[in-house]
Amino acid sequence: MFQPQKHTLVWPTKSDKGEPIAHVHYQPLTMGQHRTLSEQHKNNDTQLLRACISASTGLSETEIKSLVTPDYTSIQNQVLELMNATASQLIEGEFDSAAPTLLIPIQSDSGQQKTQYTLKPPTVATTDLMDTHANEWERTIFISSSCTGFSQSELERLSLSDWNQLQERLIDFLQQPAAYFHPKT
């Protein structure tokens, strides 16, 4: 299970309430959080990054602006690393790509906790159906749901690392020949 990471500030600051902040904890964003923030800050990468840092750390915009630049750079780098990592990069031990373990378990639509899922390659009929969707996002959600059995709302609850892992494998399914998937001996 993923444990939140911590950065000890070299230059402690104060919270909006005047309390000292000496440590900042990082939590992975969910795919849904990131999608919402991306839509809100479409044309401003700096604001998007700061919104992602705020969502990951719980720091307000004012608290982020009170950080000294070296501490901010450390936090920014760690948040970006979490946002871009795949679950297999963060999970210790062997990773099963056919039945991946979730870095951060989610609650299913039925209320059960999901700690892993079964990933199956799409059929040609499924990829034909995927191509009928109007835009890239709809195609991505359709193929992700078809290959995992997750609903759109369950997909939105996946951590970005779990989402990145899923997308990496789906790209393999859509682009690689069968020989790519044979076990290596």
PLM segments and residue spans:
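Charged interaction scaffolds used for protein-protein
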Residues: 1-43, 55-57, 61-132, 153, ...
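Mixed-charge, glycine-accented linear interaction segment located at domain edges/termini
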Residues: 136-154
